[in-house]
Amino acid sequence: MKRISILGVTGSIGTQTLDVLRFHKEDFELVGITANRNIELTLDIIKEFSPKYVAINHEESYKKLVDLVKSEGLKCEVIYGMEGLVKVATLDEIDIVVTSVVGMIGLKPTVEAIRKGKDIALANKETLVVAGELVMREAKENGVKILPVDSEHSAIFQSLQGNAHNKIDKILLTASGGPFRGFTIEDLKSVTPERALKHPKWNMGQKISIDSSTLMNKGLEVIEAHWLFDCSYKDIEVVVHPQSIIHSMVQYTDGAVIAQLGVPDMKLPIQYALNYPNREGNISEKLDLFKIRELTFEKPDLDTFKCLKLAYEAGEKGKLMPTILNGANEVCVELFLNKKITYLQIPEIIEECMNTFDYNKEVTLDNVINLDKEVRQYIYEKYN
């Protein structure tokens, strides 16, 4: 039996991970969880799965949960803040950590978990975006497996099994194209948060839905793929595939292309990461190719969806430039959702930050965290 912690248990990936655990009750024990504000759902999860440790990162919610746990006689330790996240990620009794929190908050607990020798089922792509050099070095030094949960990176990981890494010609990273595929810049001027949140294929949280609409999500995945699979940026090609059936592909030097196909359901890559290297039965729908009938492919429009282009630029410049890109994007998405900036201002402000801040510093935990704070403060003061 594998013992696990889930960081971000009430989010989209977290709740789907719970679905996998319900289906494989004999294979996993949930030891620790973290959440932010959704205390009602957190309480339900505590009652169902009986985790020993629960970390809450929102102060009022933490106090509320402490009272509820006590009044209902539940046996778990409730911990507050970043200290709590790190504790849940580094528990002696766990084997693997599912990092499904959104944004920079996942960095410190993930790094500390790696230093404790815990395998990582990685759904928090920002961790590799801002500190890929540090994370992969720590993973290697501590003998830790980084198992991708993003459907695209899971597909690449699966397509690499049994093949020599030095025989890769390029990685083909698929993208649905988002809700605005085929739009012009003029069309995007009137985009509202409500429209941007309606993804055609995937049911996701707010932040990743906006990122998918701007193609920043794909840009972050390009940087993530660079670190996970040790490929140069020129060998990572984004392919728009509206059906979202092929989750990504690897082309080898002999011309062969190996792909992983499946219905668009995050439970598939979650289960693969948790069960690796084994394959087990799944609650997800099976792929029926006769229903699909056709698969189509397009090149991404980098002029209209500039975020993807900016991500490539940030990745190629390296050092702390991806930290600037990521921090600026997180704040811009928040301001857009709150209707403080327009949709087209998102790439404009990100590019402004990339041209404003010094990125040529060593990638350390402190440098990443400090620069991220500076970038966020700059945008809040100027645009909020």
UniProtKB/Swiss-Prot annotation:
Entry keyword RNA-binding: no
GO biological process: isopentenyl diphosphate biosynthetic process, methylerythritol 4-phosphate pathway involved in terpenoid biosynthetic process
Annotated transmembrane regions: none
Chain positions recorded as 1-deoxy-D-xylulose 5-phosphate binding sites: 125, 151-152, 176, 199, 212, 217-218, 221
Claim: Plastid is one of the keywords in the record: no
Family matches, as Pfam families: DXP_redisom_C, DXP_reductoisom, DXPR_C
EC main group: oxidoreductase
Its EC number(s): 1.1.1.267
Stored NCBIfam families: Dxr, PRK12464.1
Similarity comment: family membership: Belongs to the DXR family.
Protein name as annotated: 1-deoxy-D-xylulose 5-phosphate reductoisomerase
Protein's organism: Clostridium perfringens (strain 13 / Type A)
Name of the encoding gene: dxr
